[in-house]
């Protein structure tokens, strides 16, 4: 039997997929260093090869694509003092894998569909996705649409979200999609060692037409592009802290009085759980500074909320001044309801 990652001999399944010992060891190490990998080429190093590529980004991406999933603490990132610490390591590994899968899909697939928020929540399969090629050029507003879709898809996969009614999920994603997108984009920018947001293709997040409307007041554009990233840089947030923070942001039970009692109860339960894990993570890094570190991380929420308000203002101003420009329905939905 052949390893589904590197095509060498494989005798067993590791992390849920047929793989060799070398790829098993690589995946174990990669769950700690996932956020540091980059590809120097077009992120297709493992699609066709005769000599095993050295690209760690594409090797890890291939591991995810064949179904490898982190399910137990094979490697101790910290000194594990009790079962809570083991649960934390497992949780972080699974959150990282989920984040990695959806980010890889975001980069490698696109769609010409124009679904609304209601369409996606009712039936995600109506979003017809196509493999991205080098010839495909994606504009900034299209990246916003795709990023919003993949954030919704990522969080719809959580079991506790699946138990919610369609009405509750609509409220939850209407409020959270932009906030999660803002935080996620800023974190990727920070990990790429840049201080300003841009699209994955390296273009300006705002078109010249948008910038032209704010040529006399560019401060709001600069805030949107740099403010959250700047705060992440200031506190030197880690990828693990980000993974827990974005879950705390998502599981906010006080976003609307229209949420059902059961939805609020579920969100409160999970928000408390993720907050407890984040505080424990801070304790593992530095016992004495844990309360301060915990508060520093949570303070990002205020900056992120302000960033979303600025973005909505710019979007609505552009729609008023250039009404003939048609954004995707999903983008309009999340702007109006945020």
From Swiss-Prot:
Gene Ontology CC: one annotated term: nucleus
Primary location: nucleus
Keywords assigned by UniProt, alphabetized: DNA-binding, Metal-binding, Nucleus, Receptor, Transcription, Transcription regulation, Zinc, Zinc-finger
DNA-binding residues (ranges): 1-75
InterPro entries in UniProt: NHR-like_dom_sf (IPR035500), Nucl_hrmn_rcpt_lig-bd (IPR000536), Znf_hrmn_rcpt (IPR001628), Znf_NHR/GATA (IPR013088)
Zinc finger (NR C4-type): 3-23, 39-63
Top-level lineage group: Eukaryota
GO molecular function, one term: zinc ion binding
Domain NR LBD intervals: 98-337
Subcellular location: Nucleus
Record's keyword annotation contains Transit peptide: no
Pfam family, any one: zf-C4
Function: Orphan nuclear receptor.
Stated family: Belongs to the nuclear hormone receptor family.
PANTHER family: NUCLEAR HORMONE RECEPTOR FAMILY-RELATED, NUCLEAR HORMONE RECEPTOR FAMILY-RELATED-RELATED
Protein name: Nuclear hormone receptor family member nhr-52
Species whose genome carries this gene: Caenorhabditis elegans
Upper lineage: Eukaryota, Metazoa, Ecdysozoa, Nematoda, Chromadorea
């Amino acid at each position: 039997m052949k390893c589904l990652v590197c095509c060498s001999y494989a005798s067993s399944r590791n992390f849920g997929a047929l793989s060799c010992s070398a790829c098993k060891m690589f995946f174990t190490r990669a769950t700690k260093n996932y956020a540091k990998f980059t590809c120097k080429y077009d992120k297709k190093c493992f699609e066709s090869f005769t000599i095993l590529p050295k690209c760690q980004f594409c090797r890890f991406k291939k591991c995810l694509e064949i179904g490898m999933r982190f399910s137990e603490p094979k490697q101790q990132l910290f000194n594990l003092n009790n079962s809570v610490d083991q649960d934390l390591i497992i949780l972080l590994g699974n959150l990282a894998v989920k984040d990695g899968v959806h980010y890889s899909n975001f980069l490698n697939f696109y769609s010409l569909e124009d679904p609304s928020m209601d369409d996606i929540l009712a039936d995600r399969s109506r979003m017809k996705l196509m493999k991205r090629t080098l010839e495909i050029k994606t504009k900034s507003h299209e990246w916003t649409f795709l990023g919003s879709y993949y954030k919704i898809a990522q969080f719809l996969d959580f079991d506790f979200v699946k138990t919610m009614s369609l009405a509750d999920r609509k409220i939850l994603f209407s409020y959270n999609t932009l906030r999660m997108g803002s935080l996620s984009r800023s974190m990727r920018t920070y990990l790429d060692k840049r201080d300003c947001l841009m699209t994955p293709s390296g273009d300006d997040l705002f078109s010249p037409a948008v910038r032209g409307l704010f040529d006399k007041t560019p401060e709001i554009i600069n805030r949107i592009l740099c403010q959250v990233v700047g705060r992440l840089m200031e506190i030197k947030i880690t990828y693990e802290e980000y993974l827990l923070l974005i879950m705390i942001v998502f599981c906010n039970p006080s976003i609307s009085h229209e949420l059902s009692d059961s939805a609020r109860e579920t969100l409160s339960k999970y928000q408390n759980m993720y907050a407890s894990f984040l505080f424990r993570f801070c304790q593992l890094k530095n016992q004495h500074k844990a309360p301060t570190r915990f508060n520093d991380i949570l303070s990002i929420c205020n900056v992120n909320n302000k960033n979303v308000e600025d973005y909505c203002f710019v979007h609505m101003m552009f729609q008023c001044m250039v009404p003939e420009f048609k954004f995707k329905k999903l983008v309009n939905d999340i702007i109006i309801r945020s």
